[in-house]
């Protein structure tokens, strides 16, 4: 693998080149990775280390000893140049380019494009086309506000895409396009729905210039399956490892994703990005305590960070940590209240307090700022479900599916909404879609099983199959075991029912739980064993029932009387005459 100093030099040059082309998101990402590289001890100075203060929970997690050794890569990297190769036309920026860049920075995109209309260098062509693309996006957003229908629906499109595709494809045919132009060409093709050509263009872009994270991100959005990901012909470079870590996470291959980030820790030991990505993977694995610790550590190192904090708010919401969520909402609101993430966090806070109308208002505000903000669409759908407004919930979930067809939460939400409407056939369709994207989640199998149990379907055998899958997927709440026992009991399969009641009882004993499910299991097992003349075993369960008060205790006494009578063959005396 390349050395830390080599990576550092590459990134420094890349930041300048990306910034020169107004690719500010990619430049910001590169800058964060630059300060995430651990400094050599000989170079430790206050200026070098001020972004690397404090311990990192992610670093502690991956460290096996005090000194961090660079892990050996699974594949060999071809040695890249010490810095990105400069284009021949970037040595001296022309006066017109400097003016156009100034207009671009002031968001005057059409002026920037017009200034460069006669400039033919690759750098100028890219900035002109990029400015034109953003001008079209800006106008599209304005039209969406002017013409929007329910929940912001609009048929507005970027009217510059056709001319941009024509020009960029011509440049590609003649070889007069660089890696940045290929990136923009891929974006345009993706917007027009030509995903196959878009992938090819983006692969060509990242292979010729691997430091543009925006190109990698666009490519990742087009990798909707592991088959597509594996088919990409990508050069070996350390940036590819960042891409694979993120792509694996989106494909819910969390172990593989974590392995990539562990590998990258060898050089980028202080990367806040890697820590946030690792927290996302742990969140998907429902390791909420670990995720909370990691986000707390992240905020200590980067206290004004808003990015990814919406995920942190989801963790606090799931843990019902109202005080911590209130603090986080207040903090991000003061930092940048017009960020979609900030609005989403405040929406989560109001949802936790049961103020669903206010929550919807903030999720709507988040969507005003970013129409493609997936979490806001899904969470707004959840709020409408809580408000029993199923039609609005369905609309919100459908918009989430439009943004990301691979998001299981939106499909699951649609299933829940149709189930509430008493339409189990529709609900089943959407639950199946959610399971396709997340087959190892017990909650989804349980939801589908309940559909099969509904009065309209009454397909109990199919429900049993789903509950068995839920058990195999690690149903921590024990819903599946209890339902399997009840279904087998209902179908007259008492041996199978006894098996699952016993398993459920073992689970409740291990977790120290009590309640109606335990009483139900004890009564069934005692009765079943008594019927099968296993009196000693039946007595054990009856004795446990005597620890209850009220009707449970009376039921136990009745069972014990029956057991004694069956054992002796004589009518039993009152229980008070027997020592218990």
Kindly give the residue locations of the regions a language model identified:
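Conserved structural position within tetratricopeptide repeats
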Residues: 173, 206-207, 263-266, 297-300, ...
């Amino acid at each position: 693998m390349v050395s830390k100093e080599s990576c550092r030099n590459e990134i420094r040059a890349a930041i300048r080149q990306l910034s020169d082309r107004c690719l500010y998101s990619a430049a910001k990402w590169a800058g964060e990775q630059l300060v995430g590289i651990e400094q050599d001890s000989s170079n430790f100075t206050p200026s070098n280390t001020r972004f690397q203060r404090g311990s990192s929970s992610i670093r502690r997690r991956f460290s096996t000893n005090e000194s961090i050794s660079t892990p050996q890569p699974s594949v060999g990297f071809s040695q890249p140049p010490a810095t990105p190769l400069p284009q021949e036309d970037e040595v001296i920026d022309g006066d017109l380019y400097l003016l156009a860049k100034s207009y671009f920075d002031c968001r005057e995109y059409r002026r920037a494009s017009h200034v460069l209309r006669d400039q033919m260098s690759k750098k100028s062509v890219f900035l002109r086309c990029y400015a034109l693309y953003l001008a079209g996006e800006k106008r599209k957003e304005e039209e969406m506000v002017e013409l929007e229908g329910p929940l912001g629906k609009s048929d507005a499109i970027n009217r510059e895409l056709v001319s941009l595709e024509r020009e960029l494809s011509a440049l590609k045919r003649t070889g007069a396009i660089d890696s940045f132009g290929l990136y923009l060409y891929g974006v345009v093709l993706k917007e027009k729905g030509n995903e196959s050509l878009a992938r090819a263009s983006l692969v060509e872009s990242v292979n010729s210039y691997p430091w543009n994270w925006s190109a990698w991100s666009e490519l990742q959005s087009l990798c909707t399956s592991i088959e597509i990901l594996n088919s990409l012909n990508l050069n070996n470079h350390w940036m590819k490892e960042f891409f694979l870590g993120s792509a694996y996470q989106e494909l819910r291959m969390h172990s593989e994703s974590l392995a990539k980030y562990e590998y990258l820790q060898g050089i980028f030991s202080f990367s806040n990005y890697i820590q946030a990505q690792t927290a996302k993977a742990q969140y998907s694995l429902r390791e909420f305590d670990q995720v909370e610790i990691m986000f707390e550590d992240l905020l200590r190192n980067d206290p004004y960070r808003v990015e990814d904090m919406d995920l942190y708010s989801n963790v606090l919401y799931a843990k019902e940590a109202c005080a911590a969520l209130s603090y986080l909402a207040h903090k991000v609101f003061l930092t940048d209240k017009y960020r979609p993430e900030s609005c989403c966090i405040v929406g989560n806070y109001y949802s936790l307090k049961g103020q669903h109308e206010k929550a919807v208002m903030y999720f709507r505000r988040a969507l005003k700022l970013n129409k493609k903000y997936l979490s806001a669409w899904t969470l707004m759908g959840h709020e409408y479900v809580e408000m029993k407004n199923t039609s609005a919930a369905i609309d919100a979930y459908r918009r989430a599916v439009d943004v990301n067809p691979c998001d299981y939460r939106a499909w699951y939400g649609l299933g829940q909404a149709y189930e509430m409407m008493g339409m189990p056939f529709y609900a089943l369709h959407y639950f199946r879609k959610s399971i396709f994207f997340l087959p190892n989640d017990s909650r989804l199998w349980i939801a589908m099983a309940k559909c099969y149990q509904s009065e309209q379907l009454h397909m109990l055998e199919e429900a049993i199959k789903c509950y068995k899958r839920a058990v195999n997927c690690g149903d921590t709440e024990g819903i599946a075991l209890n339902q399997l026992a009840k279904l087998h009991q209902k179908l007259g399969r008492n041996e199978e029912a006894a098996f699952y009641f016993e398993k459920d009882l073992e689970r409740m004993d291990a977790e120290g739980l009590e309640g109606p499910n335990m009483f139900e299991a004890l009564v069934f097992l005692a009765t079943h064993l008594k019927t099968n003349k296993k009196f000693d075993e039946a007595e054990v369960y009856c004795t446990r029932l005597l620890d209850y008060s009220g009707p449970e205790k009376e039921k136990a006494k009745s069972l014990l009387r029956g057991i004694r009578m069956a054992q002796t063959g004589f009518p039993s005396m009152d229980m008070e005459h027997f020592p218990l």
